[in-house]
Design a protein with these regions (language model features):
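Non-catalytic cap/lid and distal C-terminal segments of serine-dependent acyl enzymes
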Residues: 1-256
Length: 256
């Protein structure tokens, strides 16, 4: 197995950034891995987080999965920002082109996976709902909620919505512009139902002591009511790496 750090000038972002890759042992024999996992970091994190804080290298080798870990701004919510950089375009187009152009990763949609934690979990579902034909399965770890309930009303990040330099203003302009857009996690579900979209398999997990546990339960109940099937798991734990380390392996085993 091998780990690669690719530092390069992104054409989409216009600055140097990093992508980290884990390749299972089979690639040393010239064979493609069984699947490719695009693995997203959380808010205030970076592309190295999964390598530093979990056993993702061991899991990649165990399940014969290549792992691609891009790096974005820690509060961008994987958006094409209204005032900033086009991170969603970067993720969904350039990162894929780099990974599939440079390395022997599996390029078949039925062998592509996406997952993330917290903000990255939101990003994983955003990618899967907005590009449903691209993945076989998607996992949202501790990032399962109505984004309007996070930033609006009495949400735990409502104060950030009032900050003119905060994530709402920079990423979307305002709550009004966020609501109903491709970044609105309720709209993903509603649009899929309206259009009869065939979605990838969906996996969600969270710690039962996580501060967003109730929000997650509310969102999953809404998905169920709308006929969107989500495989759900929970375990004791907070918003922490012990949960994400356990659940990313469970997802990898479940998705194959």
């Amino acid at each position: 197995m091998g780990m690669l750090h690719f530092d390069y000038l992104s054409q989409t972002l216009g600055y140097h950034t990093n992508i980290y890759f884990i390749l299972p042992a089979c690639t040393h024999e010239g064979k493609a891995p069984a699947a490719t996992l695009y693995l997203l970091h959380g808010g205030a994190g970076n592309g190295m987080d999964w390598i530093r804080y979990t056993s993702i290298e061991r899991y990649a080798d165990k399940y014969n999965i290549a792992v691609v870990m891009p790096e974005v701004d820690g509060s961008c919510f994987y958006a094409d920002m209204k005032h900033g950089y086009n991170y969603f375009t970067y993720l969904t187009e350039e990162v894929v082109a780099v990974a599939e152009g440079l390395l022997p990763v599996n390029k078949e949609p039925e062998k592509r996976l996406v997952a993330g934690l917290s903000m990255g979990g939101y990003g994983a579902f955003k990618w899967a709902f907005n590009r449903p034909d691209f993945f076989a399965a998607a996992a949202n770890l501790s990032g399962i909620s109505f984004i309007m309930d996070i930033f609006g009303g009495n949400g735990f990040a409502a104060k950030d919505a009032e900050d003119k330099c905060g994530p709402v203003a920079l990423n979307w302009g305002s709550l009004e512009e966020l609501e109903g857009s491709m970044s609105d996690s309720k709209e993903w579900v509603d649009k899929a139902v309206r259009e009869g979209t065939k979605l990838p398999k969906l996996f969600a997990a969270i710690g039962t002591e996580d501060y967003s546990y109730k929000l997650s339960c509310d969102y999953l109940q809404y998905c169920k009511e709308q006929g969107i099937e989500v495989h759900y798991e929970e375990m004791p734990g907070q918003h922490e790496w012990a949960v994400w380390d356990t659940m990313i392996e469970r997802f990898m085993a479940w998705a194959l």
